[in-house]
Amino acid sequence: MHSFYIQLDLFKRHRIRMAPTRKTRRNNRRQNRPSSKIQHHHMLLRLELQRCPTKHDKEKVSRMIQHIIQDINMKSLATPHVYYVEYPKYNEGLTGIAPIETSHIAFHFWTRPDPKILHTAKSNCLLEFDIYTCGSLSQRNVGHVLHHLTQYAPTYADITILNRNTGLTIERHMHWNSEQSQLSWANWLETPAFH
């Protein structure tokens, strides 16, 4: 016992620091980890639609993207940039990007997609849409995005949420097909999957 008190006295007098214990090192590592709010979610959305926006709808689509940004609790860094692409052939359609505080939203509507790549007879338009954020995308956020796209009468949806925090991990995958599902688009959006 006596030697313990002598060592303790030496540490106090000479301000000698003890080597960190295993438990201390573990706690320090935990404190240095990024917050769980940093998830690096990436939503990849492939939608087939009955209706496609035209080149005259650039402003309308820009407003829709601004509403999506608000509804998923993101912060816009600039007005979305929306363009109509005419060339090359079969690439025609609206395309755009919106910078957000945590990264970006990017999309392209193909007004004349190759019918061989479409899944339903009613599909006339193809939309590829992605949101990347170093934040988190909840099921409710995904539902908000899909709700805004309802105006184009979706016929097929393929949605993948990647968590890119430590790799490319598929966190969620959802699929809907108007010709195979017993649920309509509106009813599908009301399921617990989006709440």
Predicted regions and their residues:
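Polybasic/polar functional segments that serve as interface/processing modules
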Residues: 2-195
